[in-house]
């Protein structure tokens, strides 16, 4: 089994916009121990088969299939694979699940097919699939800039996170495309950032467009003022120095709130695979 861990954005600032429409960001990616898992069966016919398709997602559009085919093309590999995906991370939750799945496909099949691509080469491939994919391939908690492709490793203290997931899908494009999105937060230098500093510029737009996000975030902030949204939503979270603190807040969650605790990781579980 090959893990594809979730990420949290410990802050997310939009500091500008390029002429081509891409937004310039600053953020810290933190891997957590909540994950999808993948399993691969080698095939000699060169076919890429997704044994566990996601309802509503055409197979050819699925990031796992696209990642596998991209690796085949880049490496001239004639082998194939049947992909089994155990999907635990919500789609449209801001946890990077699809990007993480794609990164794990690149890392796993590069290893299993023995294609010999380096991690920087896999990061370049990943960027063509999505802006977050290279960070998952890279394998370390990072301070990321640009459109997410420029990053610096960062050491983070151990923390436990209480994550609340409103049962909705927040489309990233709807948040970044909103005219009211704040796009001029002053940039900070990565060496000056400290845990707990910063905010998520996408939060106000997501809360206005999706009342469930606002409801969950407001509830969590009443119990943990440091709470914020991750990515473009829908999940919100709060970090704690100990798991016991997170469990105390979890115990107060209304029964109809989807909530869980995850621990921060020092690095991606596949950080040392080659």
Curated annotation (Swiss-Prot):
Q: Which residues bind ATP per the record?
A: 90-100
Q: Which Pfam families match?
A: GHMP_kinases_C, GHMP_kinases_N
**What Enzyme Commission number(s) does the record list for this chain?**
2.7.1.148
Enzymatic reactions: 4-CDP-2-C-methyl-D-erythritol + ATP = 4-CDP-2-C-methyl-D-erythritol 2-phosphate + ADP + H(+)
List the Gene Ontology MF annotations in alphabetical order: 4-(cytidine 5'-diphospho)-2-C-methyl-D-erythritol kinase activity; ATP binding
Q: Which stretches are transmembrane?
A: none
Key words, A-Z: ATP-binding, Isoprene biosynthesis, Kinase, Nucleotide-binding, Transferase
InterPro entries, per the entry? GHMP_kinase_C_dom, GHMP_kinase_C_sf, GHMP_kinase_N_dom, IspE, Ribosomal_Su5_D2-typ_SF, Ribsml_uS5_D2-typ_fold_subgr
UniProt keyword Protein transport present: no
Answer whether the UniProt record assigns the keyword ATP-binding to this protein: yes
- Pathway(s) served: Isoprenoid biosynthesis; isopentenyl diphosphate biosynthesis via DXP pathway; isopentenyl diphosphate from 1-deoxy-D-xylulose 5-phosphate: step 3/6
Catalytic residues as annotated in Swiss-Prot or TrEMBL: 7, 132
Q: Name one GO biological process term.
A: isopentenyl diphosphate biosynthetic process, methylerythritol 4-phosphate pathway
Q: What class of enzyme is it?
A: transferase
Instruction: Provide the function of this protein.
Output: Catalyzes the phosphorylation of the position 2 hydroxy group of 4-diphosphocytidyl-2C-methyl-D-erythritol.
User: PANTHER family annotated for this entry?
Assistant: 4-DIPHOSPHOCYTIDYL-2-C-METHYL-D-ERYTHRITOL KINASE, CHLOROPLASTIC
Family per UniProt? Belongs to the GHMP kinase family. IspE subfamily.
Q: What protein am I looking at? A: 4-diphosphocytidyl-2-C-methyl-D-erythritol kinase
- The source organism is Dechloromonas aromatica (strain RCB)
Lineage, opening ranks: Bacteria, Pseudomonadati, Pseudomonadota, Betaproteobacteria, Rhodocyclales
UniProt lists the gene as ispE
């Amino acid at each position: 089994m090959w893990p594809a861990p979730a990420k949290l954005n410990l802050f997310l600032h939009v500091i500008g916009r390029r002429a081509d429409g891409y937004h310039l960001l600053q953020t810290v990616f933190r891997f957590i121990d909540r994950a999808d898992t993948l399993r691969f069966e080698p095939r000699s016919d060169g076919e890429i088969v997704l044994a566990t398709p996601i309802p509503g997602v055409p197979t050819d559009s699925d990031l796992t299939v696209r990642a596998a085919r991209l690796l085949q093309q880049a490496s001239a590999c004639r082998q194939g694979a049947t992909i089994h995906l155990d999907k635990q991370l919500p789609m449209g939750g801001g946890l990077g699940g699809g990007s993480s799945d794609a990164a794990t496909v690149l890392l796993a099949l590069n290893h299993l097919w023995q294609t010999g691509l380096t991690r920087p080469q896999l990061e370049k491939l990943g960027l063509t699939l999505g802006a977050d994919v290279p960070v998952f391939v890279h394998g370390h908690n990072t301070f990321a800039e640009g459109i997410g492709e420029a990053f610096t490793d960062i050491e983070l203290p151990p923390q436990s996170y209480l994550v609340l997931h409103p049962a909705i899908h927040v489309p990233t494009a709807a948040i970044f495309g909103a005219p009211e999105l704040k796009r001029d937060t002053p940039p900070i230098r990565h060496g000056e950032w400290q845990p707990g500093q910063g905010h998520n510029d996408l939060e106000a737009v997501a809360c206005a467009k999706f009342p469930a996000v606002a409801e969950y975030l407001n509830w969590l902030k009443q119990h943990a003022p440091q709470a914020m949204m991750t990515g473009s939503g829908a999940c919100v979270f709060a970090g704690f120095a100990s798991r016991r603190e997170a469990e105390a807040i979890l115990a107060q969650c209304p029964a109809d709130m989807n909530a869980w605790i995850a621990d921060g990781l020092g690095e991606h579980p596949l950080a040392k695979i080659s």
